[in-house]
Amino acid sequence: MATITDLLNDLKIDLGNESLQNVLENYLEELEQANAAVPIILGRMNIDISTAIRKDGVTLSEIQSKKLKELISISYIKYGY
């Protein structure tokens, strides 16, 4: 969850990233509440992140892009399912 928080902190300085920020804030809260299996939450999060970026034409800095790739890669970890 630190990765989401770090990315959110970086995004708050840039304008035009509101929908991506909203997606990340919603999923951070959902992960903290743990109402569903983590792999399912992360899979949905990846789809919603992609949609937000395409919809708003979000441009990320190199650092933000690196953090986003790190966040997305977390969902590729196999949980034994």
Curated annotation (Swiss-Prot):
This is Uncharacterized 9.1 kDa protein in BM1 immunity protein 3'region. It holds the Pfam family EntA_Immun. GO terms for biological process: bacteriocin immunity. InterPro entries: Bact_Immunity_Domain_sf, LciA_Immunity-like.
